[in-house]
Design a protein with these regions (language model features):
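Short glycine-/aliphatic-rich beta-strand segments at the starts of folded cytosolic domains
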Residues: 164-172
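Active-site His/Glu-centered metal-binding helix of metallohydrolases
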Residues: 158
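Long, Pro/Ser/Thr-rich low-complexity/intrinsically disordered regulatory tracts in eukaryotic proteins
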Residues: 1-147, 154, 162, 174-176, ...
Length: 224
């Protein structure tokens, strides 16, 4: 059964949990400097890597998908619109049947591993993605610096390279006028809050994403 069809903890408020880690192969140029040949090498390495560590992951090149299939991944929040719009020979995903594991290949970083669950499941998602990360590091040399941690294309992700987020539905807070107070509290705890369909706007929907901000100088466990 697909993860989004299952009931989750606290799912009257928390619609889903997502944890993502960004990783790059140590001996390959980062995305901004990589040639098409480099990115094809990354793609082939990712295909081999995720085939070896298994987890039922299927390798799919975006270019080989029809537009409806690609768009369905966007609607399930597995990838974003920009990723499928810019698809060429080098972009791909690795995904399992339950769709709770989805790896983006050659988006902003070489590989972006995502784990999903319905409801509030921070510990379970972390345990799964940590297990995946350990297996990746056993098989490949990943770009890492002893001082800074994992190296990523975007400086904001350097360190753990991990983003933890929950998708929440908050219609009551908005109607009672308390939403702004909650937004201020969330930001004090080092997290962002944004409308799922655009930056926070009172005219938008009542569905919000709350991700962490800090990745440098903090452990993965402390982020959770």
């Amino acid at each position: 059964m697909n993860w989004y069809c299952e009931p989750g903890k606290e799912n009257d408020v928390v619609l889903s949990t997502k944890i993502e880690i960004n990783r790059n192969f140590a001996d390959e140029p980062f995305m901004e400097k990589a040639s098409e040949k480099d990115l094809l090498d990354v793609q082939n390495r990712a295909k081999k890597l995720f085939g070896k560590i298994n987890y039922g992951l299927k390798y799919l090149k975006l270019k080989d998908m029809d537009i409806l299939t690609r768009q369905s991944f966007v609607e399930k929040n597995l990838v974003n619109q920009d990723f499928i719009a810019n698809s060429s020979d080098v972009e791909a995903i690795c995904i399992n049947d339950e769709e709770n594991i989805c790896v983006k290949v050659n988006e902003k970083d070489h590989i972006e591993i995502q784990v999903f669950s319905s409801g509030l499941e921070l510990d379970n998602c972390f345990n799964l993605i940590n297990e995946l990360d350990n297996k990746i590091n056993e098989e490949e040399k990943i770009a890492f610096d002893k001082r800074f941690g994992y190296l990523t294309s975007d400086l904001i992700n350097v360190g753990t390279g991990m983003q933890v987020s929950v998708l929440v539905h908050l219609p009551g807070l908005k109607k009672t006028g308390n939403l702004q107070k909650i937004l201020d509290i969330v930001e004090k705890f080092g997290m962002n809050i944004r409308n799922e369909y655009g930056e926070y706007n009172k005219q938008n929907t009542d569905v919000y994403q709350i991700p962490n901000r800090q990745t440098l100088g903090i452990s993965e466990k402390d982020t959770i």
